[in-house]
Amino acid sequence: MSKEKALESALSQIEKQFGKGAIMRLGDQEAAHDIDVIPSGIIALDVALGIGGYPKGRIIEIYGHESSGKTTLTLLAIAQCQKQGGTAAFVDAEHALDPKYAKLLGVDVDNLIVSQPDTGEQALEIADMLVRSGGVDIVVIDSVAALTPKAEIEGDMGDSHMGLQARLMSQALRKLTANIKRSNTLVIFINQIRMKIGVMFGNPETTTGGNALKFYSSVRLEVKKGGSIKDGIDVSGNEIKVKVVKNKVAPPFKQADFELIYGEGISLEAELIDLGAKYNIIEKSGAWYSYKGKKIGQGKEKSKEYLKENTAERDEIERAILELLLPNKYPNKDSNDSPKEGSKIKTKVNPAVTQDELI
């Protein structure tokens, strides 16, 4: 029997025993397809992720220091999922979800599925059941640090429980991974940072829950606070920096910078001004910003106010930025080709280099 016939016989036997689709060539029509995504709700982050959003059927880890904007990122993703007609679930192990803030970010709180589990085992079992149902598009677990093993809860304060949480996460992720891929569900774990004791060289920071999540995650995002945004003498928000430290679906190590305004969420207008000026969609001369030869404001704050009031121009600028930076997802209406130097939208950055250093 030739090699080809032996292989076809083996493939046929595998399909017969385990079902159609259990094994296939990567070039087969059933296997070859673009990755489905859920937009992050932040243009700069969609670009940094390389595919226009979070990949479905994968595990994502978002980690960072306290009050750095981790939960905000997940709520924005939930809002985007719901806008597309999807169903979202939030496993609130920290018991700290603020419905008012979620609503402010665009989340349909009436249709958001929420669970506040008592133990880590219960939280992960609920997440697994939601994933296996196939009826949920995104599941957020907030947070890994709050997934307390049952043995620790039932034990006395001060008892030592070495490695319990790491074992729990390792076991759960082994079980979850195949179901997540099969149901094409996006699962986001929020994680916290801890300090490793006795580290003299290198980064002493690490995440909770052992190493399993680091391996199983297709994308890992590190969230950091930047400088303060001031309205006069009052602090009205923070600059946020998100670094893609691991990415299995696109080139990693890109960074997204944006503004988080207290009580409002992410400032879309600030993002459009920054990206528009960077790629010459918005002209900047001194302190003045202009769009298509028309001055829109002196200074960033005035320009933000203008875009808030003039939604048609804001949407036009947003579309131009998306067509330039994510041409595969948002094709140019005027041309099938990606914008080049000297075209209608001119860029200061060489397009060949752009995809490696966009943000």
Swiss-Prot record:
Biased composition range(s): Basic and acidic residues: 331-344
One GO term of the biological process aspect: SOS response
MF-aspect GO terms: ATP binding; ATP hydrolysis activity; ATP-dependent DNA damage sensor activity; damaged DNA binding; single-stranded DNA binding
Region Disordered, residue ranges: 328-359
Keywords associated with the record: ATP-binding, Cytoplasm, DNA damage, DNA recombination, DNA repair, DNA-binding, Nucleotide-binding, SOS response
Family that this chain belongs to: Belongs to the RecA family.
Name of the protein described by the UniProt record: Protein RecA
GO-annotated cellular components: cytosol
Database matches in InterPro entries: AAA+_ATPase, DNA_recomb/repair_RecA, DNA_recomb/repair_RecA_CS, P-loop_NTPase, RecA-like_C, RecA-like_N, RecA_ATP-bd, RecA_C_sf
Positions of ATP binding: 64-71
Major localization class: cytoplasm
Gene name of this polypeptide: recA
NCBIfam families named among the record's database cross-references: tigrfam_recA (TIGR02012)
Pfam families named among the record's database cross-references: RecA, RecA_C
Entry annotated with the keyword ATP-binding: yes
Function: Can catalyze the hydrolysis of ATP in the presence of single-stranded DNA, the ATP-dependent uptake of single-stranded DNA by duplex DNA, and the ATP-dependent hybridization of homologous single-stranded DNAs. It interacts with LexA causing its activation and leading to its autocatalytic cleavage.
Localization in the cell: Cytoplasm
